[in-house]
Amino acid sequence: MANRINLNATSYHGAGAIAEIANEAKAHGFKKAFVCSDPDLIKFNVTSKVTDILTANGLDYELYSDIKPNPTIENVKHGVEAFKASGADYLIAIGGGSSMDTSKAIGIIIANPEFEDVRSLEGTAPTKNPCVPIIAVPTPAGTAAEVTINYVITDVERKRKFVCVDPHDMPIIAVVDPDMMSSMPKGLTASTGMDALTHAIEGYTTKAAWEMTDMFHLKAIELISKSLRGAVANTKEGREGMALGQYIAGMGFSNVGLGIAHSMAHTLGAVYDTPHGVACAMMLPIVMEYNQECTGEKYREIARAMGVTGVDEMSQEEYRKAAIDAVKKLSADVGIPSVLEAVKEEDLQFLADSAHADACAPGNPKDASVEDLKDLFRKIMA
């Protein structure tokens, strides 16, 4: 069987990388940008770091900010209408997964108008045309949406999130500039960083993992583990390490999928509006404990990548526990809670059914039943 890798046509990394946006826009002959960014980034003058560059280079743009942290079907509909009215010919996504997922959905629907209802794109989307060109500029280090073929939309009416998988939505250019991440709050840095670690660990242990993605994921685990605490403290080294680590994780998991930590996190986000990274961080060690019997020696390498010493002398039980404990400690060190008070016993059936139906669930190394998922959700109850 052939293994596929989809990546950006071009990516820029390092402090000051956003200066390349104007050069790329001119080189591609773009006329007007549709800039997607959430209201907080606009309020705190993060978005303006990019729009000021556009203005200085005589590049026209229109700003769209009707974006929620868990972007909704309505956000996408309004975005499609606004894009059509704008006269823009490319998108610039500035922010985290919310801005990028909204941009991807807009770009796909504009290029494939037969899929006007974004719900029709759930799962492996059958589009024929590449989306409107996207230049993606992440601000938190975590989602890696700038280098993935996935986007996640919330169906508020049905209280669920759905995943769309489509190589046509890949941004043509990713600009990963740690300076864009320096103004992010500590809590957001922590939660998105744990999302990145979840990407790396789930991608490493998923059923579809192979040698190249294993290489990506182990390096990502190493970088994230040694950088996240520093990033939360807003050190230069921490921000730079997280910027690279989360991107490398995206290079991997986008091409092999994830597991039930993500399917459960999607459900928590849809039902309780739990921040995605917080939900991932809560579920990751619980799911690792559940999956451990189906992971061979991979937890030994996870423990090693996370800085645990003496793993070669450990028994299977010891190195698996060491890997899980390292994840728990990192999560606690950056202030992530381990319980979610909103979860009630009467919610468990709906939560488990939704997580079981999520597109990420089949990739889990251990097949999880609805009853298994109920038991796992129970572990985060207060």
Predicted segments with their positions:
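Catalytic phosphate/nucleotide-handling subdomain of diverse soluble enzymes
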Residues: T267-M306
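N-terminal small/polar loop signature for handling phosphorylated ligands or for N-terminal nucleophile
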Residues: I42-F115, R229-R239
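Short glycine/serine/threonine-rich phosphate/pyrophosphate-binding segments
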Residues: I18-I21, K43-V46, I73-V76, S99-S103, ...
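Glycine/threonine-rich beta-strand-loop-alpha-helix active-site module
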Residues: E74-D179
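Carboxylate- and glycine-rich phosphate/diphosphate-binding segment that chelates Mg2+/Mn2+
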Residues: N150-V256
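An N-terminal, well-structured beta->alpha segment
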Residues: M1-Y64
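C-terminal charged capping/lid subdomain of soluble metabolic enzymes
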Residues: Y299, A303, T309-A382
